């Protein structure tokens, strides 16, 4: 007769433990990092090929109303506007400036979040046992805890966290204004390159007309020589003028090619660009850009960027000074605790935590003073960088 031997509790729980272990290993093996893809590069497919054959990807770009007005006055045909849009979408430095803005905004969000308490929820199971019965009786534990509370929140009595948040905010504003300054600088550079290309094209067209005219005069001189009206020396002189005009034409073609290459480099070798008819002279400066009031000149993005950096430096000084005062941190929690999960929600299983902490630096090897000195020096550097921006628009 077969008898049924009951399995022990530890053996019956073995499948559950194995499943839990496998689940933990599966979660641990998951990777949240995105798949790596090598970025596309604006380089030729083979050595020796032209880089124009590999146009770079262009990011979408828009223009402000003032920029639209300026570009329309400088080039009514719209070619300059297309060049500026291509440059804003292609230029890697400008794209990097935009990413710096996003980085500074994220850092400001992190710093500003320190001013608010962080509410955490947790579930913990602690088990500790010993083979020695006496040690297990004294030090063994089997405890399950579920909690909801605030951990390590600093009570900002002396403004340290507030000043750090203000410094991060002004750094973010300065970075955003720096991006606008870089945008204006790029716009000015593309306008300059476009006008230089147009002027070079006009000089090439003039040189082409002169060379054709010299060639026509040479043919007339040769006909007159055959009729006996001109000597061979006169024909040789006319032929020398033709050679000189051809050399000037070749030089003008090379200059126009360099100017067009510089423009293409700025605009990312856009494939939808076609050369506009060259102009003989650069367009005149729009009237609304002449004799601007000084207050308008002080609104430049680079000047506003410098001012925001100055404000950030001042806030950093305040944070460095607050490091000399006590730092008060608070950890709180409320929840339930039991020696088993099954009794976790029973009556009488409540638990709470209140853990204030006051820290006053006594000996830090001069770190706090050095940080304060550093903040003061950086503030003075910001002042020194700001003053030239105030004077330069008026000069």
Residue map of PLM features:
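Small/polar-residue-enriched beta-strand and adjacent coil segments characteristic
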Residues: 32-39, 79-86, 90, 95-98, ...
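Short, flexible active-site loop motifs that bind/organize anionic cofactors or intermediates
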Residues: 70, 225, 242, 296, ...
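Alpha-helix N-cap/helix-start motif at coil-to-helix transitions, marked by capping-box chemistry
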Residues: 74, 208-212, 286, 373, ...
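Terminal intrinsically disordered/low-complexity segments used for targeting and assembly
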Residues: 2-18, 24-89, 169, 253-298, ...
